[in-house]
Design a protein with these regions (language model features):
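Acidic/histidine-rich alpha-helical segments that form the ligand environment
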Residues: 82-118, 125-139
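Short, contiguous alpha-helical
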Residues: 2, 13-28, 33-78, 119-176
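Extreme N-terminus of proteins, especially the signal/transit-peptide cleavage junction
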Residues: 1-7
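Short Lys/Arg-rich basic patches
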Residues: 8-12
């Protein structure tokens, strides 16, 4: 496989561990359990439910689907949860899962990116599974940031003092 295959793996890992996860940590730090579990209505998700959903998705698609671990996901439970688990506990759970998935992705031989896999009820390649998780994580990270902003106001994820946005979150280095 070409260098682009390795670059895809490297960039996927970087986005999950060095971009999305630290932003979720920064955005949710200091929120109360009530903030974390607040819902606009019963059809909407709370920050807590979104974090559980990301945890379940990453575990099912990467750790199980690509890494071979048992699939123990209870997807509906991610949305039904109402126990008001503290934000720090939720983040620790999500962070542990993302770092476990990072080890799985890091171990992938780039020449296997086009190999077939079946995850949930979908037939796809290894590359498509990684791409799907990264895209899905990005979408829900944005939702978490929006909900956190409702409670905290400016999340201060960027230093704007130089005229060019510079990430302030741990690991943030990419330009936006």
């Amino acid at each position: 496989m070409s260098d682009i295959s390795q670059a895809f793996i490297d960039q996927s890992r970087k986005l999950l561990t060095d971009s999305y996860l630290p932003r979720i940590e920064a955005a949710t730090h200091g929120l109360t359990a009530e903030n974390i579990w607040w819902r606009a209505n019963e059809e909407s998700n709370s920050i807590g439910n979104l974090m559980l959903h990301l945890d379940g998705n990453v575990r099912q698609w990467i750790i199980s689907g690509l890494g071979g671990a048992a699939d123990v996901r209870r997807r509906q439970g991610e949305f039904d949860e109402r126990t008001k688990m503290p934000g720090a506990e939720l983040f620790a759970k999500l962070s542990g899962t993302v770092h476990e998935a990072d080890r799985v992705i890091a171990a992938i031989d780039p020449s296997t990116l086009l190999e077939p896999r079946r995850i949930q009820s979908y037939d796809m390649t290894v590359m498509r599974a990684i791409y799907t998780v990264v895209e899905h994580f990005s979408m829900h990270t944005g939702q978490i940031l929006l909900l956190a902003k409702m409670w905290k106001g400016d999340l201060a994820l960027y230093d704007l003092s130089s005229g060019n946005p510079r990430p302030t979150w741990k690991g943030g280095r990419e330009g936006h």
